[in-house]
Amino acid sequence: ELFHLKTPYLDCPQCFFYNSRALSGTLYIGIAKQEPEGAEPLMDVTENLSDEVPLGCIAVKDYSENTGLLAFLKSIGFITEVVEKRRSGYVEIPICRYDKAVLEDTPGQPGGKV
């Protein structure tokens, strides 16, 4: 399903989630904007950490240009719970449970993959 992404730094209609796996096997989730000629990647949702996150959870990048992303993801029902926060450098990364069905609900993107 397409959604209107709204954070302190971005106000962008016609967005959708896409996903893949990092070389480490960790789930990668990004947000892209649907354009007439294709998709334009906008931002990373997930952060790659040195240690594993609990099963069914992701590490959400909610700092720098992604500030406000966690609140937005909660508002659309994608993030269901923040289970912990982990320090990574100078920031704390929220570790969150998410609704997997949202990734599968992107028109024209089977399984939400680009």
What are these regions (language model features)?
Residues 1, 14-15, 76, 96:
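Short non-domain terminal segments
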Residues 1-8, 84-86:
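Short acidic-hydrophobic surface loop/beta-edge motif
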Residues 2, 9, 14-32, 38-44, ...:
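Catalytic phosphate/metal-binding cores of nucleic-acid and nucleotide-processing enzymes, i.e., regions
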Residues 23, 28, 36, 54, ...:
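Intrinsically disordered, low-complexity segments enriched in small/polar residues
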Residues 30-78:
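Acidic, aromatic-enriched beta-alpha/helix-loop junctions
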Residues 62-110:
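Short, compact, well-ordered microdomains
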